[in-house]
Amino acid sequence: MGNYFNTLNLRQQLDQLGRCRFMEREEFADGVNFLKGKKIVIIGCGAQGLNQGLNMRDSGLDIAYALRPEAIEEKRASFQRASENGFVVGAYQQLIPTADLVINLTPDKQHSKVVADVMPLIKQGAALGYSHGLNIVEVGEKIRQDITVVMVAPKCPGTEVREEFKRGFGVPTLIAVHPENDPKGEGLAIAKAWAAATGGHRAGVLESSFVAEVKSDLMGEQTILCGMLQAGSLVCYDKLIADGKDPAYAGKLIQYGWETITEALKQGGITLMMDRLSNSAKLRAFSLSEQIKEKLDFLFKKHMDDIISGEFSRVMMEDWANGDANLLKWREQTGKTAFENAPKGENIKISEQEYFDHGVLMVAMVKAGVELAFDTMVETGIYEESAYYESLHELPLIANTIARKRLYEMNVVISDTAEYGNYLFANVAAPILAKEIIPTLKRGDLGESTPATEIDNILLRDVNDAIRQHPIELIGQELRGYMTDMKRISSQG
């Protein structure tokens, strides 16, 4: 096996990267009918596995879970989750041969072993599903030619897939068919029915490709979604402590600040987030964001280049083979940081507006990171719709995990692949921010309100125009029109 993307010629690579079509709601008029009466077996019962399965069952589909024998014998967490929710659970040999659609929702690093174990058991002409294409694109897994290979990738953690479905809604979703494995031409019909069963069609579905999903997903999670939040949390907390702020206050401002700030981002993009600031603070946040972009532009491009070339996956898979030595080392180091061990501050009251007023630097980091990630993806050939979902859209969902249990929770919820990429980015970004940005800060940038200053109307007009006319704001306004039912995400109520 070898990296699938690297076997394609340039024309094919550009074609796959540029696959992105926003599907009309009418295209889902048949709902789940294509999969009605067919046996669907999910491998793995983690967050995505369980919650997708619950939604699909509630949509009228026949769902069972295939687990490894030891998971069943030892009654591990995956077995307990599936059993307690009333699903049929069995070993691979028992369930896989009966399945019309096998969905592999195990962690990325297990995919090759899982596919090797189950492919001989999959019946002729059945389908194999993924929710992330790393195994196909980066590992280069070759699937039997009679098997249809599809992907349905909800753009949020598994818990949110379930919560939005229970509200009668769904989460934005990417679907794709692997061009090397669509022998009967049924791949798109399978993917559409699967997406409808999870509720994704109610929030907007992009018809994409395995390649575009993988390359954009890796870029988003490494940079703005996880890496920037981790680097920003560590640097901002250390700055607050250096300025003599109460550790409990500093910890709470950072822990809940990302969530509060990005809630505005979710509802109205960067424009609304910046509008939550006073005019003086907005001008300062804009200036800081431009400084941050200048200092981190090379790092965003390096991550994108390493993702496109396959270098990132090569290095990560070397770490897999080495027992996750680097991943575990970086995870341990994160657990020992000052921010992670800050007092909880349960008795400290911070109003919603105070998170903005005292978090101007954090707002600037969000703006810079979102725009850099989006721009870098688009420059690489990824369509704006995909770049939006993999940067701005998912950010409030990840910020919500930090609000629950800080960086520990974020790194538990995201995949090992995302966690590894997060550390690669944050370990470089944090020292740059500490050296190049923190010394330039002024009173009111972090931990206290920006002093009121005389406002130049022309400057304010130009800054507002620059914010609102950025391409991510234009495509975001269009895509958010499909998500008018979005609920507020908040750990604080």
From Swiss-Prot:
All residue ranges annotated as the KARI N-terminal Rossmann domain in the record: 14-208
Entry annotated with the keyword Signal: no
Keywords: Amino-acid biosynthesis, Branched-chain amino acid biosynthesis, Magnesium, Metal-binding, NADP, Oxidoreductase, Repeat
Domain of life: Bacteria
Catalytic activity field: (2R)-2,3-dihydroxy-3-methylbutanoate + NADP(+) = (2S)-2-acetolactate + NADPH + H(+); (2R,3R)-2,3-dihydroxy-3-methylpentanoate + NADP(+) = (S)-2-ethyl-2-hydroxy-3-oxobutanoate + NADPH + H(+)
Family annotation (HAMAP family): IlvC
Protein name (database record): Ketol-acid reductoisomerase (NADP(+))
Organism name: Histophilus somni (strain 129Pt)
Name of encoding gene: ilvC
